[in-house]
């Protein structure tokens, strides 16, 4: 059963800053592969980001958490790989 995908306010703000081509790829990925298999398409992060996963879309990354109890993927941030881990 596919997971429900939700974007935080910060992630929505990040989406508005993306180039149109990247935005389309991120949205397609989020509601496609990510919603179907969130554990397979991302990798778990460590240290201060433990419990968070990172998935690639070209040179951009999506940071997300998985709520298995409610079958929901919550996308926390979307940004270029050089900037996403800095905040």
UniProtKB/Swiss-Prot annotation:
Q: Which UniProt keywords apply?
A: DNA-binding, Hydrolase, Nuclease, Repressor, Toxin-antitoxin system, Transcription, Transcription regulation
Q: Name one GO molecular function term.
A: endonuclease activity
Question: InterPro entries per the record?
Answer: RelE/ParE_toxin, RelE/ParE_toxin_dom_sf
Biological-process GO terms, alphabetical: mRNA catabolic process; negative regulation of DNA-templated transcription; negative regulation of growth; RNA catabolic process
Domain of life of the source:
Bacteria
What triggers expression? Expressed in log phase cells. Induced by treatment with rifampicin and gentamicin as well as by oxidative, nitrosative and nutritional stress. Induced in the lungs of mice infected for 4 weeks. A member of the relFG operon.
Q: What class of enzyme is it?
A: hydrolase
Kindly give the Pfam families that the UniProt entry links to this protein.
ParE_toxin
Question: What effect does gene inactivation have here?
Answer: No visible phenotype in culture or upon infection of mice. Significantly fewer persister cells are generated in vitro following exposure to rifampicin and gentamicin, but in infected mice no differences are seen.
The answer to whether the entry has keyword Hydrolase is: yes
Q: What is its EC number?
A: 3.1.-.-
UniProt lists the family membership as follows: Belongs to the RelE toxin family.
Q: Subunit comment for this entry? A: Interacts with cognate antitoxin RelF, which neutralizes the toxin. Also interacts with non-cognate antitoxin RelB in vitro, in M.smegmatis this neutralizes the toxicity of this toxin.
| Function per UniProt | Toxic component of a type II toxin-antitoxin (TA) system. Has RNase activity and preferentially cleaves at the 3'-end of purine ribonucleotides. Overexpression in M.tuberculosis or M.smegmatis inhibits colony formation in a bacteriostatic rather than bacteriocidal fashion. Its toxic effect is neutralized by coexpression with cognate antitoxin RelB2 (shown only for M.smegmatis). Overexpression also increases the number of gentamicin-tolerant and levofloxacin-tolerant persister cells. In combination with cognate antitoxin RelF represses its own promoter. Has been seen to bind DNA in complex with antitoxin RelF but not alone.
The entry's protein name is: Toxin RelG
Q: From which organism does this entry originate?
A: Mycobacterium tuberculosis (strain ATCC 25618 / H37Rv)
